[in-house]
């Protein structure tokens, strides 16, 4: 499973949104209805899923689904 698909599954599960709404350009707040607590929980779940720690300064830059995928992909290089 590619990173995008893993991230998408986490978002659908955590936020209860339709999978069709989860695109790389989708904003967590504006398009998916996430609040700051939802985003913090998503970050923790991403950390668990990918076995990493996302520093707060990096987490603050994750505003879209694509941002999350790019960050995860950058860890694998």
Curated annotation (Swiss-Prot):
How this protein is processed and modified after translation, per its record?
4'-phosphopantetheine is transferred from CoA to a specific serine of apo-ACP by AcpS. This modification is essential for activity because fatty acids are bound in thioester linkage to the sulfhydryl of the prosthetic group.
> GO CC annotation: what is one?
cytosol
Pfam (any one): PP-binding
Any S-S bridges, and between which cysteines? none
List residues of the Carrier domain.
1-76
Lineage, top-rank taxon, reads Bacteria
Location in or out of the cell = Cytoplasm
Segments traversing the membrane: none
The GO molecular function terms of this record are: acyl binding; acyl carrier activity
Ordered alphabetically, the record's keywords are: Cytoplasm, Fatty acid biosynthesis, Fatty acid metabolism, Lipid biosynthesis, Lipid metabolism, Phosphopantetheine, Phosphoprotein
O-(pantetheine 4'-phosphoryl)serine is found on 36
**Pathway(s) where this gene product acts:** Lipid metabolism; fatty acid biosynthesis
The record's InterPro entries line, in alphabetical order, gives:
ACP, ACP-like_sf, PP-bd_ACP, Ppantetheine_attach_site
**What is one Gene Ontology biological process annotated in the Swiss-Prot or TrEMBL record?**
lipid A biosynthetic process
Is Phosphoprotein one of the keywords UniProt gives this record? yes
Family, per entry: Belongs to the acyl carrier protein (ACP) family.
Q: Briefly, what is this protein's role?
A: Carrier of the growing fatty acid chain in fatty acid biosynthesis.
Q: What is this protein's name? A: Acyl carrier protein
Gene name linked to the record? acpP
């Amino acid at each position: 499973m590619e990173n995008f698909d893993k991230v998408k599954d986490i978002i659908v599960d955590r936020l209860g949104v339709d999978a069709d709404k989860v695109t790389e350009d989708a904003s967590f707040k504006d398009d998916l209805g996430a609040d700051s607590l939802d985003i913090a929980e998503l970050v923790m779940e991403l950390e668990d899923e990918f076995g990493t720690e996302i520093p707060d300064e990096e987490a603050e830059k994750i505003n879209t689904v694509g941002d999350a995928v790019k960050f995860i992909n950058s860890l694998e290089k």
